[in-house]
Amino acid sequence: LELHLDRIYPNRDIVAIKTNNIASYTDVLVTCMRQNPKWILLSEVRSAEAVMAVRNSISSGHNILSTIHADKASSVPMRLYSLLESNQDVGQFLATIHRYVQLAICVKGYMSKELGRFQREIMEVCEFYVDENNNPCSNVIYRKNIGGGFVIKNPSKYLLEYLDLQ
């Protein structure tokens, strides 16, 4: 999808860059940041290099939208950490992720017998933030239960303040 957005939205200011054996995640994200975009869409975070490139980009104030394979939204920070190949301090890494990643959304896909087609559903939405004492925190604001019911909680003041600034 991300490589075709310029064709889907021809009147939008979109630049698509693909990584390969010459241009790495780091190279591509540095090039993107030089263009000062509002958003960077990274197809998938699946390597230590991608994790570090994303972390460096978001900590410099750039907004990134990406995907990652995780069992639920609330486990995304630890999933990012598990992709690292270094012995970086887990507490420091998680604090950085909680400071700069506002939301994670878990989408599950399945074959719907009722609809006779592949279906995707949002299963969990989790916000991340660092509180007044600099502690990394998370708040699951939506979760769909196996039985079909769901749980909804209010977002924190941190997410509301962030959204007000956007």
Model region roles, listed by residue range:
Residues 1-96:
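Switch/coupling sub-region of P-loop NTPases
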Residues 12, 63, 100-104, 120-123:
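Active-site lining segments that contact anionic ligands and/or coordinate catalytic metals
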Residues 35, 56-62, 101-109, 133-134, ...:
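Short flexible/disordered coil segments
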Residues 82-104, 108-116:
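Cys/His-rich Zn2+-binding cysteine-cluster or related metal-binding knuckle/ribbon modules and their
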Residues 115-166:
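NTP-binding/hydrolysis catalytic cores, primarily Walker-type P-loop NTPases
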